[in-house]
From Swiss-Prot:
Pathway: Pyrimidine metabolism; dTMP biosynthesis via salvage pathway; dTMP from thymine: step 1/2. It catalyses: thymidine + phosphate = 2-deoxy-alpha-D-ribose 1-phosphate + thymine. The keyword Cell cycle does not apply. It holds the Pfam family PYNP_C. GO terms for biological process: pyrimidine nucleobase metabolic process; thymidine metabolic process. Homodimer. Belongs to the thymidine/pyrimidine-nucleoside phosphorylase family. GO terms for molecular function: 1,4-alpha-oligoglucan phosphorylase activity; thymidine phosphorylase activity. This is Thymidine phosphorylase. Gene3D superfamilies: Nucleoside phosphorylase/phosphoribosyltransferase catalytic domain, Pyrimidine nucleoside phosphorylase-like, C-terminal domain, Transferase, Pyrimidine Nucleoside Phosphorylase, Chain C. Keywords: Glycosyltransferase, Transferase. It comes from Shewanella piezotolerans (strain WP3 / JCM 13877). InterPro entries: Glycosyl_Trfase_fam3, Glycosyl_Trfase_fam3_N_dom, Glycosyl_Trfase_fam3_N_dom_sf, Nuc_phospho_transferase, PYNP-like_C_sf, PYNP_C, Pyrmidine_PPas_bac/euk, Pyrmidine_PPase_CS. Disulfide bonds: none annotated.
Amino acid sequence: MFLAQEIIRKKRNAEVLSTEEIQFFVNGITNNTVSEGQIAALGMAVYFNDMNMDERIALTTSMRDSGTVLDWKSLDLNGPIIDKHSTGGVGDVISLMLGPMAAACGGYVPMISGRGLGHTGGTLDKFDAIPGYNTEPDSALFRKVVKEAGVAIIGQTGDLVPADKRFYSIRDNTATVESISLITASILSKKLAAGLDALAMDVKVGTGAFMPTYEASEELARSITAVANGAGTKTTALLTDMNQVLASCAGNAVEVKEAVDFMTGAYRNPRLYEVTMGLCAEMLTLGGIASNEAEARAKLNEVLDNGKAAEIFGRMVSGLGGPTDFVENYSKYLPDSQIIRPVYAEQTGFATAMDTRELGLAVVTLGGGRRKPGDTLDYSVGLTKVCALGDEVSADKPIAFIHAQSEGAFAEAEAAVKKAIHIGDTKPEKTPEIYRYIRESDL
């Protein structure tokens, strides 16, 4: 028998907690025998004194096991259960293509995603722009779509990881969100509850990233790779660039359009292509579908070029209640804003830097993101044809197009976009889309 206050005292004194102590505390979070004050106190003790890898693994697996852990054995699937998770960014539409691409190559992708908050967009918000698409299906429908389409992208159900829901809301209110140990456990407990064989982790770096510096992003990537592998799920983390908008757009309906265009081959943003291929190829190699990256990329290019990935996306959309002809006729179903107009630079030159976070916040001010949880969104608004770093701009060459519902909203977003995209005389050097891979062998 343990006492919550003694566990808090140990961590306050920078001692190592046993797996049993951590399991006891997490059980208390779930069944409300540990108070909010005690949870907040442990969170702050961990924030200051940290956890070693064994403690992080114990916290992650205890939180994973606090609710239902999905089991796919009864479905007799003939491929691995694989997934990816991103720390979030602006114009990060990767999940919409990556899930169907991986499924088209023989994987099964039960992707449990989140909504946007702050400057980052949420995958579920993009799907909410599709009429009829059900992001909260019951378990039977979720499993049916995973089996039949190979991929289903839905929201977190109430019976998954209840400990994290309670712990996270308290961390959010007590300034302990930034702890790498607690971030690791929060992300991975949710992902590993999906019953995965393998996971590719996308940790963003730069002005639109969740972590403030490259060093902090790398520390998080190393922690996630070590803990996930320690918990029994093959995992690699990729450090990817978020110093500019990843797709050519940012918003909800506009990102869905770009994702469909990517899969059909109508338009593939080269930066988006590189990061999507890097993550998806890693999923295929970790899952044993491909023996190396070159083979994985060849398979992925094939399912893009022969239309199989787009077909599977369409099957997922219709399976979850969306239109059966969505891929062919998306413009019929996705909303358009009242105003769609270009923004021009004040001077001629090159796009030299981008405050990606500010561009994400511009989408929020347009109504495409949340100021607080529960806000309703306007799915039609956002930014499109956003210039890339190194692009030449001038008074007659737009830096972006703004999709707004009123003149006032347009003017506010226009000022934000002009401020966020820096113009200079010298073309900047190209930065890599993927900075590095952190595999278990690198730890």
